Amino acid sequence: MIDFGFDKIALIGAVALIVIGPERLPKVARTVGHLMGKAQRYVADVKAEVNRSIELEELKKMKTDFEDAARNVEQSVSSEVNRTSSEMNQAWESLSSSDGNGGSSGSAAADSYHAGEPLSEPPPAYTHPRKNWRLKRGAMPQWYKQRHGVRAKAQSGAARVARFRPPRPL
């Protein structure tokens, strides 16, 4: 902000003491201090806002660059796929035209495929093994259950108290 040296501050203080007077000088100095603090906070907020806007502009620029690069990659991939598919279609057309002319350029499996005949039996349909899910649930070893105190039988609190209550003296 404004740079004041010691001599300038002393001169301003002496003039303020003469003009304002010793009774109101502390109150005025406190008010000036508050106003200076507010001004410094305002300047800091403006700086932060400017920095944020600059960073936002940089991020927007990076976003557009990234989108352009992605668009270029997409275009190159799609053109390559189109070129490859056209080459494959041309090769397929040349093969089908040579097969249609009576030439035997394919194997017996290809001929049977074009004729619609299956090459072999279809695989058998999947059947579920129908395992007992309760066995899978109880797969925890006994030693683990005993060590960690896993209850084998559920009991209510009252039944547990009755079970472990010492017998009554006769």
Swiss-Prot record:
InterPro entries: TatA/B/E, TatB. Residues 69-170 are annotated as: Disordered. One of its GO terms (molecular function) is protein transmembrane transporter activity. It is found in: Cell inner membrane. The chain crosses the membrane at residues 1-21. It is a single-pass membrane protein. Residues 73-93 have a biased composition (Polar residues). GO terms for biological process: protein transport by the Tat complex. GO terms for cellular component: TAT protein transport complex. Residues 128-137 have a biased composition (Basic residues). Pfam families: TatA_B_E. Gene3D superfamilies: 1.20.5.3310. The keyword Cell inner membrane applies. Keywords: Cell inner membrane, Cell membrane, Membrane, Protein transport, Translocation, Transmembrane, Transmembrane helix, Transport. Its main location: membrane. Part of the twin-arginine translocation (Tat) system that transports large folded proteins containing a characteristic twin-arginine motif in their signal peptide across membranes. Together with TatC, TatB is part of a receptor directly interacting with Tat signal peptides. TatB may form an oligomeric binding site that transiently accommodates folded Tat precursor proteins before their translocation. NCBIfam families: tatB. The Tat system comprises two distinct complexes: a TatABC complex, containing multiple copies of TatA, TatB and TatC subunits, and a separate TatA complex, containing only TatA subunits. Substrates initially bind to the TatABC complex, which probably triggers association of the separate TatA complex to form the active translocon. Belongs to the TatB family. This is Sec-independent protein translocase protein TatB. It comes from Methylibium petroleiphilum (strain ATCC BAA-1232 / LMG 22953 / PM1). The gene is tatB.
